[in-house]
Amino acid sequence: MSEKEKGKFIVLEGLTCSGKSIQVPLLVANLTRKKTGITAVLDSEPTNESFGRVARAYIEGSPVAFLDRVAKRAARELVYSSDGVSRKLTSVLECIGRGERISIIDLQLIFMADRMRHTDKIYDWLAFGKAVIMDRYALSTLAYGLAQGVSIGDLVVWHGLILGKRKIDPDLTIYVRISARTAAERLAMSGKITDINETEEIIKKAETAY
């Protein structure tokens, strides 16, 4: 039996304000409360690890000094690879650290690197028979990348290069469906500071991509 087969990997996907971030902890709590014998773990992307902090800081428009600090920390954790991936990620991190705008595909590379570095934790949880309930995973990369004009081919190729054999396919993906209009209305009412992925136009295109 492989490590992955010992536990279950369940992902909730959806547009901004779809309610998935509410449903994930509820699902974890219900699995625990109903004495199913399943130990459930709540997880989400972007993570709170180095590349996840870079991604979040960039899309939220954080000050350059903070971007520089988190980008340098992530760069120190890069492992050299002969396929050019580490050089590419280093270049993207340097641009972010200088406060420069990066392309959408380069931003998605940071999300992918965050996913890659987090897979060891997911594999460990699964190996111990835990159910990992994840708020966003690879489909978010595809949906929001496509919504901003990146080709599916480029996204798939880079995802394969960065994650390689570390890629984990979910046992179940649940799409929490709401319309782009409802998502935009909820976002406006929430008072939340929006990031660059949360414009009404991108939300509409992400709905189509999903």
Model segments located where?
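A glycine- and Lys/Arg-enriched "phosphate-lid" helix/loop adjacent to the NTP-binding pocket
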Residues: 139-208
